[in-house]
């Protein structure tokens, strides 16, 4: 797929962060929240070509706002760079240039105008589903930033696990 850049592969980084936050037995400890389950259900339900909207929301979000979240978490939680591997894109030295490359690949996808509109709608819905996860995590935990970081890891791991 034209937007399946190797630089975006996150599973090893995700596993490293999960081990940092939950320990070696993390696979038996964490489970998806209701909002995460709804997100995964949506991803499984839609036509594969509309996953582009989720891909765009996830990765451009991680390369933009995710970098801000990473820096805030690192400073406010004194993480010294640990537990943040998910937000490290070692193969992307210049996120701005990469995002331009990604957008060019999107612009060149062989899709119809109407599919493009549906992909945009799905990207907006993916953003809403992400916000549902944040709302659920924030309302149930005393440390919102840590809960958000951990919740993103749970969401992502839940989505990866559901594809296997």
Where are the regions a protein language model picked out?
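Metal- and O2-centered redox machinery and metal/ROS homeostasis
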Residues: 1-164
